[in-house]
Amino acid sequence: LSSAGNAEIFVAASIDSKPRRLTINKSLETSPTWSPDGRRLAFTSDARGKPQIYEMPANGGPMRRIPTNVSSYCSEPTWNPIKENLIAFTAAVSGGFQIALYDFKTRSSQILTTVSQSAVEPTWMNDGRHLVFTQRQNGRMRLMLLDTETKKVSSLHVPDFGDASSASFVY
């Protein structure tokens, strides 16, 4: 949301409650994702100039940069619904974008995809193992399935299917 000209993170207890602003600064905060236990939020912020992944308590408090260390441009975090220690995100790598994974336990990241054209918008499936992401292929947007353990990527499209992006699942 934005009431001051820059995107900020807000929460509300219900549809009838007044939204409460969690981030208050001049940087842009976008793409919030809840931890599985509902106690933390991860999001994208350009507080240091370029987009990076941050986290904070869901009830407010200081935001802390997650040290992904794979790119100076990281965005679109998505928290694993089962494995609370894992966040997938989009990272700028070698002139394109790839899907990466951060592990809070090991405090390390790894690039999961090596597609020739950009991979963006990761979304976890409810099994906590697979991600669906958007890939640009020959000028078209396609949904792809990534097995995070084997790093195998499969297309979810049939040849005549049109553009598709921004997958979302209800659990």
Predicted segments with their positions:
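Sequence signature of WD/YWTD-type beta-propeller architectures
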Residues: 1-171
